[in-house]
């Protein structure tokens, strides 16, 4: 343990910025400072995101001097895979270790339309949702843009073996994305850029628990990214019980921000609604939810919850899920039930990391 601590301390003291944190224009600016032509930025991005090399020596069309400058200035290492769990349905959950010893989760989900990745934006989470394993242990730190980018790069490297690609992504992993707004936006722009992994903006979804000021800010961004709200309750009292953030950002104010976003962007918003047995899954809850969303351009995604040992919530019975869905549909709400994936592995958000933390403290 003492050796591990010393190694992590050394990593912190000697850490260079990640090259994966740089957007193309930032790389061009750096090259200009080094007296190098800016077209080299495109070549560097090609090595990073198309060929996905792991060291600067492989960047054969760059001069030795430029490779040395890159090596002296930026870290090219990505993430260390601690655990890789594969479900019977093809879902793969990765537990990655960061340079400072913290760990994060990333999930690859396979669909008929392609491969989707769920990325993490923070080590832990401060929001405190009572149903989520991600909040166990609290928030440790924000991820850098490059650490979020590296999750996609590492998963894409795993897919390279079978000549597959990441075709879409959701920012719904550990942490509150809008609490790490600048790094989130840097990540999205790098991944979306044609010189990056070039995942289309409309194939990316960002989810928030409801940080209202950032919703207004997000509405002004120029990326056509899908937007989702973790709602989980049809009224303020129940939402405050499930999601303490509702005490700071009240549901009526949240709905006003959502309406502004929809009117400003013209885009439909998705409401994520986890179903918790006996808590928020009754017909009266569905009726109340339909009334809350009346007139809002939206889609509701019903989520049968994964069981989390550290929490007391139970799964809603299958027939009750269908009744909830029917109640919404009968009232004109666009709704679907999320297909469960990774049910036979630690699929709940933060669950694999929580298990690893338990092992570390034994």
Curated annotation (Swiss-Prot):
Organism: Bacillus anthracis (strain CDC 684 / NRRL 3495)
EC number: 2.1.1.192
PANTHER family on file: 23S RRNA METHYLTRANSFERASE (PTHR30544), RADICAL SAM CORE DOMAIN-CONTAINING PROTEIN (PTHR30544:SF5)
UniProt lineage: Bacteria, Bacillati, Bacillota, Bacilli, Bacillales
Gene that produces this protein: rlmN
Required cofactor names: [4Fe-4S] cluster
The protein, known as: Probable dual-specificity RNA methyltransferase RlmN
Amino acids binding [4Fe-4S] cluster: 125, 129, 132
GO CC annotation terms, alphabetical: cytoplasm
Gene Ontology molecular function terms on file: 4 iron, 4 sulfur cluster binding; metal ion binding; rRNA (adenine(2503)-C2-)-methyltransferase activity; rRNA binding; tRNA (adenine(37)-C2)-methyltransferase activity; tRNA binding
């Amino acid at each position: 343990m003492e050796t591990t601590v010393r190694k992590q301390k050394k990593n912190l003291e000697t850490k260079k910025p990640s090259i994966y944190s740089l957007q193309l224009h930032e790389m061009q600016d750096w090259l200009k400072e080094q007296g190098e032509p800016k077209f080299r930025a495109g070549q560097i991005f090609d090595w990073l995101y198309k060929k996905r090399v792991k060291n600067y020596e492989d960047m054969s069309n760059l001069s030795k001097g430029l490779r040395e400058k890159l090596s002296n200035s930026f870290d090219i290492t990505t993430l260390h895979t601690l655990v890789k769990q594969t479900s019977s349905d093809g879902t793969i959950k990765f537990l990655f270790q960061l340079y400072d010893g913290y760990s994060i989760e990333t999930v690859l989900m396979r669909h008929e339309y392609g491969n989707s990745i769920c990325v993490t934006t923070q080590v832990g989470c401060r929001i405190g949702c009572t149903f989520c394993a991600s909040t166990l242990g609290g928030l440790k730190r924000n991820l850098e843009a490059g650490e979020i980018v590296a999750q996609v790069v590492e998963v894409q490297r795993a897919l390279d073996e079978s000549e597959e690609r990441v075709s879409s992504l959701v920012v719904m992993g550990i942490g509150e994305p809008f609490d790490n707004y600048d790094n989130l936006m840097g990540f999205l722009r790098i991944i979306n850029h044609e010189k990056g992994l070039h995942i289309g903006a409309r194939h990316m979804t960002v989810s928030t628990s409801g940080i209202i000021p950032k919703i207004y800010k997000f509405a002004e961004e120029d990326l056509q990214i899908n937007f989702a709200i973790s709602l989980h309750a049809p009224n303020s009292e129940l939402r405050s019980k499930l999601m303490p953030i509702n005490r700071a950002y009240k549901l009526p104010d949240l709905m006003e921000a959502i309406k502004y976003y929809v009117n400003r962007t013209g885009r439909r918003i998705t409401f994520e609604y986890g179903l918790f047995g006996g808590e928020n899954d009754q017909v009266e809850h569905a009726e109340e939810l339909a009334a809350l969303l009346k007139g809002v351009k939206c889609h509701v995604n019903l989520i049968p919850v994964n069981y989390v040992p550290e929490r007391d919530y139970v799964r809603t019975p299958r027939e009750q899920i269908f009744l909830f869905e029917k109640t919404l549909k009968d009232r004109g709400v666009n709704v679907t039930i999320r297909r469960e994936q990774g049910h036979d592995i630690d699929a709940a958000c933060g669950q694999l990391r929580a298990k690893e933390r338990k092992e570390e403290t034994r």
